């Protein structure tokens, strides 16, 4: 009974406090083609992190000021753990959990995965009281084929708007894939939300949060950043075809109809079939860069 096993693992992980260790390692230097990166280990954390926040007004780095959110629903500050106030439907099943943290004024909002009455979905939760600000429709795929690693997990602010990525949570092409082209669903999109509307929803739970689709046809858009007034994202392809995109309003990036990757082979749950790869000929936005084979692309800074 794989779903029972998933449920047991979910219950155990949600109640397991993160293990954190204050350490200080020697500095290491990693050399690339045109730059080098100096690193040293300052914290050892065995649990998956969802987001790290550091106050921008700090002149000298102090790791005790780090606020670390873990995927299983804890926040760590000054090396002290605290369990977050999350709804009962919050789930870690199928690689779920907290996927990103959004800051609007003094409010912290979590994008989380949820499970209720055989329905997997995503929602936005106000962390100070656990109130739900938004909930997606149910994912149509069989429970065992969902994979919340594909939910996406990135947000940026530009002018008066919040931009948030939601992917199609799946291991391989499935019933979830076409949602990226379906405007009735939020999955497979870059979403645009007016920040003042979020504040209205926080102040009045009866308000409906207005969410616009900025772009669509995204598979797993895990990285989002802005350079001046331009928005860029990186996303996972299937087997090959990771992408760097310039994201424009009303752009359609083609998933699952086009990709420079292919379906996974049968031993990985796919059928091994190729996918149309020419975006432009099929009236979709071409990526700035497509990577074959995949590099497991994630964040973009």
What are these regions, as identified by a protein language model?
Residues 2-170, 223-237, 293-301:
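Acidic, Gly/Ser/Thr-rich repeat motifs that build Ca2+-stabilized beta-propeller blades
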Residues 2-26, 30-32, 57-69, 96-98, ...:
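Beta-propeller domain segments
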């Amino acid at each position: 009974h794989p779903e029972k096993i998933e449920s047991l693992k979910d219950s155990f992980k949600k109640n397991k406090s993160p293990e954190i260790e204050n350490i200080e390692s020697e500095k290491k230097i990693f050399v690339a083609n045109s730059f080098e990166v100096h690193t040293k280990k300052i914290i050892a954390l065995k649990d998956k992190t969802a987001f790290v926040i550091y106050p921008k007004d700090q002149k000298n780095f102090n790791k005790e000021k780090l606020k670390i959110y873990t995927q299983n629903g804890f926040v760590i500050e000054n090396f002290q753990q605290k369990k977050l106030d999350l709804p009962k439907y919050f789930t870690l099943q199928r690689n779920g959990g907290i996927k990103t943290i959004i800051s609007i004024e003094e409010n912290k909002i979590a994008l989380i995965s949820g499970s209720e009455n055989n329905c997997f979905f995503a929602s936005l939760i106000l962390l100070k009281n656990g109130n739900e600000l938004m909930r997606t429709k149910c994912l149509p795929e069989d429970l065992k084929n969902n994979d919340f690693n594909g939910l996406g997990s990135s947000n940026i602010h530009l002018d008066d708007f919040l931009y948030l990525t939601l992917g199609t949570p799946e291991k391989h092409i499935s019933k979830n894939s076409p949602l990226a082209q379906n405007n009735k669903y939020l999955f497979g999109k870059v979403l645009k939300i007016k920040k003042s509307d979020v504040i209205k929803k926080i102040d009045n739970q009866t308000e409906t949060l207005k969410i616009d689709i900025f772009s669509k046809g995204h598979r797993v858009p895990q990285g989002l950043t802005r350079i001046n007034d331009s928005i860029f994202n990186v996303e996972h392809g299937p087997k090959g075809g990771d992408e760097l995109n310039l994201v424009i309003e009303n752009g359609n990036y083609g998933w699952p109809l086009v990709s420079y990757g292919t379906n996974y082979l049968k031993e990985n749950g796919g059928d091994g079939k190729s996918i149309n790869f020419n975006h432009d000929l099929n009236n979709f936005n071409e990526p700035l860069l497509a990577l074959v084979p995949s590099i497991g692309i994630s964040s973009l800074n």
